[in-house]
């Protein structure tokens, strides 16, 4: 009996231990994988993990990484609001200048630009890959700590003489490369559509068919979509050109310098007169540099504005050619329709004349005795008289229609 109790207690202790062993793992939450670990997941897993998307981060030192990040991570790195970040995920082109970042959406290129780095959405898109290659070319990798420090100070420290005068700020150069890639994309599409347009228009002038008309309609739809893209980006650039203050908001490096100067002034132990004199000298020197950079930015925007304006005019010219061809095709169709109507009227007039002759023949075919039946050789004269009557009726009707200008 005692051995039975001991074995039962041993089994209960083993069972309790097993229950504890089974419960311990359930109390531990699974570790959250890093952003880079989610890159290879499926679309459903990305949605379950809070909208993780593939982003490419490229900084001013030439360092580049590709990782899957959610919106909260991008907001934390770029200091933009969630409302502004939604602009990058929309299908409409938009350029937003904020305190610490620029949200750029050119449809094919979607990026968040800061004074230190640029984050590109849709890393596997061909246009984004082209932009990444251009960035690698313009910002070669600097692996050494001295080079990294020099590159950072070169863009952010004022220096009065060799600071910002030596080259454009990082964000300006990224904008320039992005506009260059976008203009190249639009230009290639315009060339392709122009080639298709001329071939389709030549075919239409030779032969009007349903297949050619379908191709023309598809081409016109593509031109309309491309024109809307170009027009939207052009309007965004024009907005910054018209508003100097908004253009100055694109200068993120200047804001960073001003913040650094403010912090240095608040933490300085220099006497107040010397500090004011030193600050005024730095401000006067930086104002000249900033004005030069703003002028450079204005010239940059004007250059791409004119380039987009030229592409827009080329697209509008192609649409005018298409509209002219459509008008020509409509004229041909109307001419053919008028010819068919003319032929139908002539046939109807002929039917009217023949019907009149048939009435005469039917009258003679009735079983009513008349004197003509006994007249010899009268049949031929009657037949030719009926034919002459039909011809006369046809000529008279056609002449009346032409007199009333119903027929040409």
From Swiss-Prot:
- GO BP terms, alphabetized: pollen development
Residue spans with biased composition (Polar residues)? 1-10
Q: Which GO terms describe its molecular function?
A: magnesium ion transmembrane transporter activity
Q: Which InterPro entries match?
A: MRS2-like
How would you describe this protein's topology in the membrane? Multi-pass membrane protein
Q: Where is the transit peptide?
A: 1-96
Primary location group = mitochondrion
S-S bridge residues: none
Keywords noted in UniProt: Ion transport, Magnesium, Membrane, Mitochondrion, Transit peptide, Transmembrane, Transmembrane helix, Transport
Q: Name one Pfam family in it.
A: MRS2-like
Q: In which tissues is it expressed?
A: Expressed predominantly in flowers notably in anthers at early stages of flower development.
Q: Where is this protein found?
A: Mitochondrion membrane
Region annotation Disordered: residue ranges?
1-44
A cellular component term, taken from the record's GO annotations:
plasma membrane
Residue ranges of the TM segments: 345-365, 378-398
Record motif Required for magnesium transport activity, residues: 365-367
What is this protein's function? Magnesium transporter that mediates the influx/efflux of magnesium in a concentration-dependent manner. Plays a crucial role in male gametophyte development and male fertility.
Further information in the entry reads:
Has the ability to complement mutants in Salmonella typhimurium and yeast lacking magnesium transport capability.
The Swiss-Prot or TrEMBL record describes its family as follows: Belongs to the CorA metal ion transporter (MIT) (TC 1.A.35.5) family.
Q: What is this protein called?
A: Magnesium transporter MRS2-6, mitochondrial
């Amino acid at each position: 009996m005692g051995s039975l109790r001991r074995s039962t207690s041993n089994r209960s202790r083993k069972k309790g231990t097993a229950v504890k062993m089974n419960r311990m793992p359930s109390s531990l939450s699974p570790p959250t994988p890093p952003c880079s670990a989610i890159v290879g997941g499926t679309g459903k897993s990305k949605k379950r993990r809070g909208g993780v998307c593939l982003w490419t981060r490229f900084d001013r030192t030439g360092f580049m990484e590709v990782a899957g990040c959610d919106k909260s991570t991008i907001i934390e790195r770029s200091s933009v609001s969630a409302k502004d970040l939604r602009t990058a995920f929309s299908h409409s082109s938009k350029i937003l200048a904020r305190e610490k970042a620029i949200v750029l959406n050119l449809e094919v290129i979607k990026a968040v630009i800061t004074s230190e780095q640029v984050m590109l959405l849709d890393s596997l898109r061909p246009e984004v890959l082209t932009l990444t290659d251009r960035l690698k070319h313009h910002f070669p990798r600097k692996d050494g700590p001295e080079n990294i420090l020099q590159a950072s100070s070169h863009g952010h420290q004022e220096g009065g003489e060799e600071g910002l005068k030596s080259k454009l700020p990082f964000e300006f150069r990224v904008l320039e490369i992005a506009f260059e890639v976008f203009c190249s994309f639009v230009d290639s599409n315009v060339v392709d559509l122009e080639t298709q347009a001329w071939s389709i228009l030549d075919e239409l002038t030779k032969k009007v068919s349903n297949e050619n008309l379908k191709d023309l309609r598809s081409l016109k739809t593509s031109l309309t979509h491309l024109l809307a893209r170009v027009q939207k980006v052009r309007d965004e650039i024009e907005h910054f050109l018209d508003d100097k203050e908004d253009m100055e908001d694109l200068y993120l490096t200047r804001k960073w310098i001003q913040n650094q100067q403010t912090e240095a002034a608040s933490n300085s132990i220099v006497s107040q007169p010397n500090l004011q004199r030193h600050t005024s000298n730095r401000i006067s020197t930086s104002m000249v540099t900033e004005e030069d950079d703003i002028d450079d930015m204005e010239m940059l925007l004007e250059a791409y504005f004119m380039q987009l304006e030229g592409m827009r005019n080329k697209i509008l010219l192609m649409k005018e050619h298409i509209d002219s061809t459509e008008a020509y095709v409509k004229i041909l169709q109307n001419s053919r329709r008028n010819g068919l109507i003319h032929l139908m009227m002539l046939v109807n007039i002929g039917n009217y004349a023949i019907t009149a002759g048939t009435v005469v023949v039917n009258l003679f075919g009735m079983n009513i005795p008349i004197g003509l039946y006994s007249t010899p050789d009268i049949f031929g004269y009657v037949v030719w008289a009926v034919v002459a009557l039909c011809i006369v009726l046809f000529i008279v009707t056609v002449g009346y229609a032409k007199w009333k200008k119903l027929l040409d």
